[in-house]
């Protein structure tokens, strides 16, 4: 269910396993995809400011979904960018909780650009694809990023490593 997103005032759909969205220009096809992305990722893929996608004269956009297993997800974004997230009617405070329930991947022309850019962009895309396949990957990825950041900080701020710093470096390397 989508309320007040661009040209979608009040829309309710019941998608099946595989769906094709068709319609004339300006009928809301992209807005529907944007609503799904907003629920999953907490942001629009078109604009960073909610006031740009919330319908005029409305205080907020709301997207609500019931997943196949009965789990309910909801997001409300207000014009001041404040956000309310709900999982099974309980307020949650971390977008990643909804993302784990409804992982999405936007494939558009910029996705193809990622493949031609540097290795960091490609790694980011691969990390996101792995997250889709194995959602337990996310906590491991967060821990890995933290270890890598600490290890690299040690290397960056130390020209000649002392014995203690070498031991610290070995522990970071072991964790990686």
Predicted regions mapped to residue ranges:
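Pre-Walker A-like glycine/lysine-rich segment at the N-terminus of P-loop NTPase domains
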Residues: 1-38
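Short, flexible segments with low predicted structural confidence
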Residues: 3-4, 8, 24-26, 96-97, ...
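Basic side chains
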Residues: 6, 29, 46, 122-123, ...
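Phosphate-binding site recognition
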Residues: 9, 15, 46, 51-54, ...
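Generic structural signal for short, solvent-exposed loop/turn connectors between secondary structure elements
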Residues: 13-20, 66-72, 78-81, 156-162
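Nucleotide-state sensing region of NTPase/ATPase domains
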Residues: 37-121, 126-137
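An accessory alpha-helical subdomain
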Residues: 113-176
């Amino acid at each position: 269910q989508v309320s007040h997103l661009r040209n979608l005032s009040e829309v309710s759909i019941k998608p099946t396993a595989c769906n094709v969205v068709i319609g004339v220009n300006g009928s809301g096809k992209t807005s529907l995809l944007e609503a799904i992305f907003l629920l999953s990722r907490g942001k629009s893929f078109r604009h960073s400011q909610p006031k740009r996608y919330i319908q005029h004269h409305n205080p907020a956009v709301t997207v609500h979904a019931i997943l196949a297993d009965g789990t309910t997800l909801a997001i409300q974004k207000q014009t001041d960018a404040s956000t309310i997230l709900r999982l099974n009617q309980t307020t949650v405070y971390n977008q990643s909780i909804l993302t784990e329930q409804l992982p999405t991947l936007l494939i558009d022309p910029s996705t193809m650009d990622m493949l031609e850019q540097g290795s960091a962009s490609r790694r980011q895309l691969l990390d996101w694809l792995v997250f889709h396949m194995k959602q337990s990957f996310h906590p491991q990825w967060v821990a890995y990023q933290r270890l890598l950041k600490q290890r690299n900080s040690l290397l960056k701020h130390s020209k000649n490593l002392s014995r203690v710093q070498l031991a610290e470096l070995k522990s970071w390397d072991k964790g990686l």
